Amino acid sequence: MYSLIEDIKKLLSVMLPILVAQISTAGITFINTTMAGHAGSDDLAGVSVGAGLFYPLLASIVGLLMAGTPLMATLLGEKKPEGLPYVVRGGLLIGLVISFLFGAAYVLFIDDLLTSLTLEAEVAYVARYYLMTMVGVVFFISMIVPLRCLTDTAGSTSTSMKLFLMAPPVNAVFNYLFIYGHFGLPRLGGIGAGLATMLTYGFLLVLFLIVVLKSSALKGHEIFHSILVKRSDVKEYLIVGVPSGLSIFMEMSLFSLIIVFLARYGTDTLAAYQIADNFASLVYMLPVSCSMALTILIATAVGAHDIPLARRYKKAGFVVALSGAAMTAAMTVLFRSSIGNMYTSDAIVASIAGQFLIYSAGWQLFDAISTPIQGILRGLKDTRVSFVLMVIAYWGGCFPMSLFLDHVVGLGADSYWLGLVFGVGCSAMLMILRLVYVERVMDREALPSFAFFMHRKITHPAAVHAVVASNVKQAKELLAFPDLYMQFSKENKFVFQP
């Protein structure tokens, strides 16, 4: 008889280091914004514009490359550690390609992009060269993420936590040197914040390389002893990673678009939205960290063909995520005025932010359902359908509902926060349906009538292969994409033996 408490302890042992690493990464952005602000308003505005354009793309890139986590965890669960170097090299290759594409896009489109924004000359100058430094940031992060996937799965999540904890103080030192121009270095203002960020991630990459190369368990020498990459590994990396990256991009781009619609309500409303959004983003790190931990644990359990263990981790994940969300939501509502005053001394802005924070509490509760399920499905390498469901929830639910509440019902700026709550609620509902469907397939039950998407299979246990085979006929009748199924089956040459 297993103990739920023991499973929760195991989940927390993986999750908490991830949470600390996430907070450390957020600390870099906070330090950049704060120190650039002291350099001048133009520097702060330039950094804000550059960061607003860059970070949705960066989050998408990280989401894509984090696909290495379930791939490596599955290999470890299957007792096939010799496959780790190929997956890592595949991730590094994809990272190199992404870095090249981002650099090429900067050269080709930066002039037209900044012109279309009609920024003041000083702000545009800072934004241009801040984004230039981000080319280096993309390269370093694209190299770090596959190595982090390796240390989190084959090693311990505490390793990446310790390394990321070094980043904020290092970043602060570089900011001090380059933003303000101390010790004979040029005073670069907001551009210096970008340069400091690039150097910080370069420093982190060196640390990750040292850790990987010194550990025999991480097979560092085997990774860099050869440049051989398996096409199948790269393909699987992209199959799992691209939908995850696109899901993040679609979600973050919606948040950016909402700012455009809120602009007509004035500066105070925009500032209040930024406060509530920033605080909600900090709280969001809790379910995201839980989701990442669930991906590692469930992928490892599934790789070992231990489906009951995967179910136990799923249950522990919901307990942790919902308990955490209940506490953060209650604290958000109770201390909303204090939170607003912590960000600004403007009483009007703080009051509006307090109202927005009430809505964010509802958002947190729905996120505690949706985000862990995404981690569970990633652990099962089920990401393509999740991406489609996220698009439906946010762009088919949240965005239209926000516009309806604003322009038809006339609720004003509150419409967009209510729309976000509705969108996250739709996402939670759709994720639950998807998880129920996947579990019914794994339980050898007939496909439910709402199974409008097929259960994608790549390298799951033989029992699951057999279950999928037994439902092929019914699945093809329910699916809107039978040709895609046939193409996938031929490419992977599945042989099912029920």
Please name every model-derived segment:
Residues L65, M134-D152, S160-N171, A193-F208, ...:
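Short runs within selected transmembrane alpha-helices of multi-pass transporters and secretion channels
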Residues V20, S24, I28, L57-I61, ...:
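Residue-level hotspots within pore-lining transmembrane alpha-helices
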Residues L44-A104, I141-S160, I259, L270-R336, ...:
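Small-residue-rich hydrophobic transmembrane alpha-helices
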Residues E6-T34, H38-A39, G52-L71, L96-G103, ...:
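N-terminal transmembrane alpha-helices
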Residues M1-I18, M72-F139, L185-V242, I298-W363, ...:
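Short alpha-helical transmembrane segments in multi-pass integral membrane proteins
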Residues S13-T29, T133, A167, T200-L204, ...:
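Transmembrane helical elements of multi-pass membrane transporters/channels
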Residues I23, G27-A45, L114-A121, L177-L188, ...:
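Helix-terminus/linker motif at the lipid-water interface of multi-pass membrane proteins
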Residues Y106, C149, N175, I179, ...:
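Structural signal for membrane-spanning alpha-helices in multi-pass inner-membrane proteins
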